[in-house]
């Protein structure tokens, strides 16, 4: 029996989930927010619905980890630090270096640091978390689990852009994809639900959260993904644009007097998507609530659904059909109407949902209509569980 902690470090946040393995029992989970900012907030959920909260000052990630571990002791979740046998770090970009999870060595850490250009908003924070945990718990196994690794199986025809080939040779300019940790978990859980090995199935995973992507999985391996070199491409998201004609960006920059491309990249990442079109919110629930009286909210939602249908339809053609369409992540797990409308838009392919079965949120369920040729599944994602499983596998080698 061992205790393994899964960590997702952001620039000012530290999310964690502590598991007892191999039973996969969650002992505690929580977040430390506003690190290096005034009035940092600590929240830990544990036991049978218990919650600890505190507002304090947290100067950096190292102090955040120290506070977290001390609080786990105070709450009697652990008796001593040595009970924690391993830590798994979610790392956004693995580039072409990493096609699977790895034990973090000095050389591995250097390579991760060299990949910050691929995920400038996330990778530096991931590195901070790794270094901070190494300082506080230097003797335990530390594992990097990459969001891009699942997509290392993409064929060239799906990861190369139609740009001069030398850009790929010189700069590794290609599609990397994201949401890979969640995609891997969901594909395995969906296979269990269908009662078949993942290697014998074709499925399309629709990860619909604040960030959103579509991933066709063929014989247990990622075959393509709607996200690209960065997470901004693909379908419409909460604040990200999804696919846009690059020439339009140059046109708008000239009209708006923008001289720095990073200004436009910020617009694409933080001011577009549902928020940009609706002018109401990045939250689908608020957009849905406003659509009856707000035409922009209505069309934002229509664009969102239409882009999903477009990508799923293309991937169905590309893979020669599928055994299942799988909904996951915040919107996918909780929006009954989005699931219904996407299925209706794909009815031509023999996809449909049963209204009664679909009337649920956040559970594992087959929600297919009786006469469906392709199953429709609801599978909540669990990235943290995937991370700690990888840590345990590597620790046992």
Curated annotation (Swiss-Prot):
Disulfide bond annotation, renumbered to this chain: none
Keyword Signal: no
UniProt cofactor note: Mg(2+). Can also accept Mn(2+).
Annotated Mg(2+) binding sites: 8, 383
Site keyed Transition state stabilizer: positions: 179, 240
Enzyme class: transferase
Molecular function terms, GO-annotated: acetate kinase activity; ATP binding; magnesium ion binding
Any GO CC annotation of this UniProt entry: cytoplasm
Assembly mode: Homodimer.
UniProt name for this protein: Acetate kinase
């Amino acid at each position: 029996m061992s205790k393994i902690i899964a960590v997702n470090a952001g620039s000012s946040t530290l999310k964690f989930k502590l598991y007892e393995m191999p039973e996969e029992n969650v002992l505690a989970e929580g977040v430390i927010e506003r690190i290096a900012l005034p009035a940092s907030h600590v929240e830990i959920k544990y036991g049978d619905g218990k919650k600890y909260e505190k507002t304090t000052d947290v100067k950096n990630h190292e102090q955040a980890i120290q506070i977290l571990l001390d609080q786990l002791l105070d709450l009697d979740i652990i008796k001593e630090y040595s009970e924690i046998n391993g830590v798994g770090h979610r790392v956004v970009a693995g580039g072409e270096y990493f096609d699977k999870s790895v034990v973090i060595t000095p050389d591995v850490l250097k390579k991760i640091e060299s990949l910050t250009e691929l995920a400038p908003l996330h990778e530096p924070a991931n590195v901070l978390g790794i270094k901070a945990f190494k300082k506080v718990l230097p003797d335990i196994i530390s594992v990097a689990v990459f969001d891009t690794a699942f997509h290392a199986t993409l064929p060239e025809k799906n990861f190369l852009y139609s740009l001069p080939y030398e850009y790929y040779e010189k700069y590794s300019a290609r599609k990397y994809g994201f949401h890979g940790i969640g995609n891997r978990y969901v594909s395995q859980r969906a296979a269990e639900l269908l009662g078949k090995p993942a290697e014998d199935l074709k499925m399309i995973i629709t990860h619909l959260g604040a960030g959103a992507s579509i991933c066709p999985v063929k014989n247990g391996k990622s075959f393509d993904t709607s996200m690209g070199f960065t997470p901004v491409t693909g379908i419409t998201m909460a604040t990200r644009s999804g696919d846009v004609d690059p020439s339009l960006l140059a046109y708008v920059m000239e009209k708006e007097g923008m001289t720095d491309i990073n200004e436009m990249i910020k617009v694409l990442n933080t001011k577009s998507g549902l928020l940009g079109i609706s002018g109401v919110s990045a939250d689908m629930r608020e957009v849905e609530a406003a659509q009856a009286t707000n035409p922009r909210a209505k069309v934002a939602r229509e664009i969102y659904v239409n882009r999903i249908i477009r990508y799923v339809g293309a991937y169905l053609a590309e893979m020669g059909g599928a055994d299942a369409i799988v909904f996951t992540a915040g919107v996918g797990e909780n929006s009954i109407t989005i699931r219904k409308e996407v299925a209706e838009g794909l009815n031509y392919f023999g996809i449909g949902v049963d209204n009664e079965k679909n009337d649920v949120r956040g559970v594992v369920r087959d929600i297919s209509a009786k006469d469906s040729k392709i199953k429709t599944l609801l599978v909540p994602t669990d990235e943290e569980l995937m991370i700690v499983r990888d840590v345990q596998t590597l620790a046992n080698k």
